[in-house]
Swiss-Prot record:
Organism: Arabidopsis thaliana (Mouse-ear cress)
Disulfide bonds: none
Entry GO CC: chloroplast
Protein name: Aminodeoxychorismate synthase, chloroplastic
Location of the active site: C172, H316, E318
Transit peptide feature range: 1-45
Amino acid sequence: MNMNFSFCSTSSELSYPSENVLRFSVASRLFSPKWKKSFISLPCRSKTTRKVLASSRYVPGKLEDLSVVKKSLPRREPVEKLGFVRTLLIDNYDSYTFNIYQALSTINGVPPVVIRNDEWTWEEAYHYLYEDVAFDNIVISPGPGSPMCPADIGICLRLLLECRDIPILGVCLGHQALGYVHGAHVVHAPEPVHGRLSGIEHDGNILFSDIPSGRNSDFKVVRYHSLIIDKESLPKELVPIAWTIYDDTGSFSEKNSCVPVNNTGSPLGNGSVIPVSEKLENRSHWPSSHVNGKQDRHILMGIMHSSFPHYGLQFHPESIATTYGSQLFKNFKDITVNYWSRCKSTSLRRRNINDTANMQVPDATQLLKELSRTRCTGNGSSYFGNPKSLFSAKTNGVDVFDMVDSSYPKPHTKLLRLKWKKHERLAHKVGGVRNIFMELFGKNRGNDTFWLDTSSSDKARGRFSFMGGKGGSLWKQLTFSLSDQSEVTSKHAGHLLIEDSQSSTEKQFLEEGFLDFLRKELSSISYDEKDFEELPFDFCGGYVGCIGYDIKVECGMPINRHKSNAPDACFFFADNVVAIDHQLDDVYILSLYEEGTAETSFLNDTEEKLISLMGLSTRKLEDQTLPVIDSSQSKTSFVPDKSREQYINDVQSCMKYIKDGESYELCLTTQNRRKIGNADPLGLYLHLRERNPAPYAAFLNFSNANLSLCSSSPERFLKLDRNGMLEAKPIKGTIARGSTPEEDEFLKLQLKLSEKNQAENLMIVDLLRNDLGRVCEPGSVHVPNLMDVESYTTVHTMVSTIRGLKKTDISPVECVRAAFPGGSMTGAPKLRSVEILDSLENCSRGLYSGSIGYFSYNGTFDLNIVIRTVIIHEDEASIGAGGAIVALSSPEDEFEEMILKTRAPANAVMEFCSDQRRQ
C-alpha cells in the first residue's frame, strides 16, 4: 500500500478527494503502528507544522476488517438508571463550547468536564473513561479547521474510533469527524453558511424526539460551517438522520416571525419522516452534493452510527437562535441513560463510584490535582491557568476546588472606607457635566485626569458619568508595557511603572503579566458594604484606565506578532471621584481612605468649588492654555496604513479562510494616522463629544506616558454590578444615518433586515454567551435583547445584550480575562480568528480594540470597547477602524464601512485643528 503524507499550515491547503478517487478508511492510516508515532508526536498548535494530511489512492479495507477496531477495550459495567449524567466535553479550540457547557450543566444535573482536544493523551483519556469510569458520555464541540488536520481535531478521532461503548455526540466539526473517521469524505459545502438559519427535516430518530420536522414546522437551526460530509461517500455504518430543506436558509429575521428562540420542545410536526430501516435498505433517495454538475438541493445535517451510540449534528444546537436546542441535548441525555440501563452484564465489574448526585466525578480531588499539574507543565492552553474552569463540581456540598491547592495565595488585605456627599439637582445649576470637569480637573490641559463620560442625550443608555484627577494619599498611576518576546520566556511578562501622588516612582517586572497584578491588587482590598449601599451607582473609587488589545496574550490568545509603541495598559487608582446622575441631575462627591488614617479634605474643597460655579449654567468654561496649531498640520488628513487595494485584498483573504472552515467571522481592522503636533487633547475631546456624543465615551490623560484617549465609543464590552450580574452589549452591523427622516427610517430598516448584519451579530452574540458561560452560573446566561437597532448622531447600529450571573468563586479580573478581547473585535472562533488577523494586520492595534473603564474597589467593573476613538501618543493621532468579514461580505463594501467608522472622529480632529489655527 502506497501512502503519501503532506504537511499543511491551514485546512485551505487540503486537496479534497476527487470523484474518481475511491473511498478510503481513515482509521488504518491514523492508528496503524507505523504512523501512530508520528501522529502523536506532532507539535500541537504550531503554525508551521501543526497539521498533517494523509492521502492514499488505495482502499485499505472495510472498517470491520481493521485491526484497531478489533482491539478489545474493557467493557464498562452498567449501573442502575442514572439520575444525572456526567459528560466529558472536548473543546476543539472553539468559541461556542461553553454554550454547550451551560446547556449540559442544567440538563444533565451536573456540569461537564471541559478539556481541550490536545490536553489529554489517549492513555489519560482511557484512564478516566474506562478505569475510573468518570464519564457517562462524550460531547465533541465545534471548532475551526477540518477533521483531516490532526491539530484541528486532536484526540477526537481516536475517541470516536475506539470508544464504541460510550455514547458520543459530535457537533459541527465533531459531526464531520464522526463521518471522516469511518471513511466519509469531508468536502466544501456548496456555499459557506455562518450565522444563518435553515429549516430541517429528520427521520424521527430518537435524537429528535419531540421535535417537529419539515418545511411547515418551527424547527429552525443555526449553521456555522464551510465544510460538509459528502453524503454519497457515507459508509454503510453511518446512517443519515437529518438534512436541510431545499431553499429554506435565510436570516434570523426571515425565520423569527414563526420561530421561538430556544424552544425546548413541542409536539412533533407534520413534516415528512423517513424510517431508519428504509435508509439502510435503500440509499438511492439521498441526494449527492453534486448531481450531474448541479448544486445539491439538500445538505446532510445529522448522522448516527448503525452499531455504536454515536451521533453527529452539523448545525449548532447551542445557538441562541436554534429552536429545540435544549430538547436535542435532553434527548442525548435520555439516549445515554437508556443506553446504560440496557447494558446488562453480571460478569463485568461494578462501577467504582457511588451513583449519587453529590459525587460528580470519582476521586474528584485526585483528578483535579492531576489536571492542575498537567496545566502547569503543559502547553498553556488551559482556561485561566488553573483547573477551576474545568469543573464546577461539589462533593457533599463542598466546592471541590477548595480541596485542591489554590493557584493564588490569599494576600494581606487593607480596609478602605468611603465618605461621600450628595448635592441634589446641582448639575444644571453649574452648567452641566462639562463645566464641572473643566472647573475641577480641566486646568493644565487635563493632565493625569479621567472622565468616563455618558455624553449621549439618551439617558436610557447611560445614566452616570465619573471624573477625577490626581488625588489623595491612595492615588497612583500604573503604566505597563509588554516585553519583547526576545527578552523573556513568558509571553505575559512586562514592565510596570508605578507613580504615587508625591511623584515618586517604582519599577517592577511582572512575570505573570498585568491582569494578574491587577487581580492581586483588588484582592488585597476589603470594604464595608454599608459605605456605598445607598449609592445608585457601582463605581465608588478604584482603578480607572485602559487595557490594550495586546493584553490578549494574558487571556489565552497566541503570542503577539506586533508590538505597540504606546503602553499596553494604563490605570489610575482614583481615591477621589465626582459622579453625575444625568437622570436626576444630582452630583456626588466621593473620597476613599484607608481605615485608621485621616480623612481628606476633598469633599469640602470640591463642594466649595461647585458652589462657586452657581449661576454659570449658560456659560461654558474653556481651557485657557489651548495652543495654536501649526498651519501645515491643520490641513493634514488621516492616512490609512493600508491602501484601498490592500484592504480589499485582506478582505478577500479573510473570505478564503472562512470558505475553508478556519473561521466563521473575522473582524479585520486597520489604522489611520496623522501628525497632530502640540494639539491639546482635552480641547479635542470637548469638540468630539459635541460632534459625536456616545454612551461609553471617555477622556483619559496619562502625562508620564505622553498618552491621551478621546473616545466616543457606543459599545459596552463588559459590566459587573453589585448583584453579580455580568452584561455584554456587542455591536455588529453599522449603517450611516439618512439626510431626511424618510431616508433615515429606510436605512434603519435596511440594517434591521440585512442578512449579512444579522449573521454578524448572531455569531458575536453566541460568542459572548460562550465567554460569559465560562464564568457564570449554569443556566443563568440569557439574551434579553437580540439585534436591536440603536441610532447615534452619525450611524445606526445593531446591538444585542447578553447577561449572566457570575459564579461566586470567580474574581472580577477573571471575568474580563474570560472574554477579552471583546468578541466583536475578533470574530469567531476567537483563538483561530486572532491568529489569522495577526497574520493579516501589519501592526499592533495598540489600545484600539481594547477597553476603557473602571474596576471599583467594591468588586464591580464597567468597560467599553475602544472604537470611534482618537488615540494620541507622542505627536501622532491614530484612529482604528474595521469591520466583520463573513461569507456574505462584499470586499468593496467592507472598505467603505471602515471609512464610515473613521469619519466622525477624523472629522472632529480636522475641525478642531482648523479652529485652533484660526484662533
